[in-house]
Amino acid sequence: MININDRALIKKAIDKINKLAEKIDKLKIMHVCGSHEHTICKYGIRDVLPENITVVPGPGCPVCVTTQKEIDTAIYLADNGYVITTLGDMYRVPGSEKSLMEKQSEGCDVRIVYSISEAVKMAKKERDKKFVFVAIGFETTAPTTGAELISLKNKDVNNFFILNCHRQTPPVMEFLLNEGVYLDAFICPGHVSTITGLKPYYGLCEKYKAPMVVAGFEPIDVLMAIIMILKQVISGEAKVENEYIRAVKPEGNVLAQKIINEVFESIDVPWRGFPVVKNGGFGLREKYKKFDIYEHEDIPEIKEKIPKGCICDKILRGEKLPTDCPLFGTVCTPLNPVGSCMVSDEGTCRIFYKYRRI
């Protein structure tokens, strides 16, 4: 068995990248996974790449791509008597005026939970209160939400709803290829691909002639993905490959896919930093819409207020890096986040802040 942390193997991979890079002009690769950015920053992978190879972070953080309007909706519901249950990262994301953490300090009932199941247990125990779970995440977390709603479908629980913020990754990849910054290739997300398998990438790869490699999260995984992309570019190919074979099956997690297809359907939704992304969201199917808070409340239109100087939108689209932001590390820090990219552990700005100071 290969030791994925073997330093000699890593050095060999870096040497291989440098040798292959001599055969091309320029190559711009995007990844769409916060865990990949952790690996790239922690181990200084960008520093060892030749100048003609660029790897940029994309919209790989579910907290970061949740829109300000969705945060404001949760705050509106908290102001109107709902118990808001949320994962820890969402608790601190700024809305147009305040965050859920600030609303809690003002007396609103906002609770941090570790899962949707914990929120459901609270709702069952406190029947006199109305609960909303802020459901975020990509294909990796949508099955958990779906499974919980399936189990609740025929049960007498009428005080539990979700604020559905789930999103799909391949559609935003297509948006970036079609309308975003110029990209040559993608390092596809490892966690998402354990659920989806390789199928969602085939159409994109064929349509846009962009190499796509699913990668794991060790330094050697990322380096090998770059090598695989380079080999495709040099040979004039564009195909989907799986570097992360120890975790990702070509067919993905079929059971999780069945749960997603049972509960959700594809819908067009905006992402933070993006306009409406075609099929970019998971909408609840008709038979599960009783859990959709939008079916029970008429949410007023709240105008977004982007903080002056914040470039989270450009960072999420791969147009800029955190170090290009005038607020980074001064006005905007993990203790005082101005934009969503500084809040979550998966956020690009948070990751840059953590590892650029080692």
Curated annotation (Swiss-Prot):
GO terms for molecular function: 4 iron, 4 sulfur cluster binding; carbon monoxide binding; iron ion binding. The lineage of its organism: Archaea, Methanobacteriati, Methanobacteriota, Methanomada group, Methanococci. It comes from the Archaea. Pfam families: HypD. Belongs to the HypD family. One of its GO terms (biological process) is protein maturation. Fe cation binds at residues 33, 61, 64. InterPro entries: Hyd_form_HypD (IPR002780), HypD_1 (IPR042243), HypD_2_sf (IPR042244). Keywords: Iron, Metal-binding. This is Putative hydrogenase expression/formation protein MJ0993.
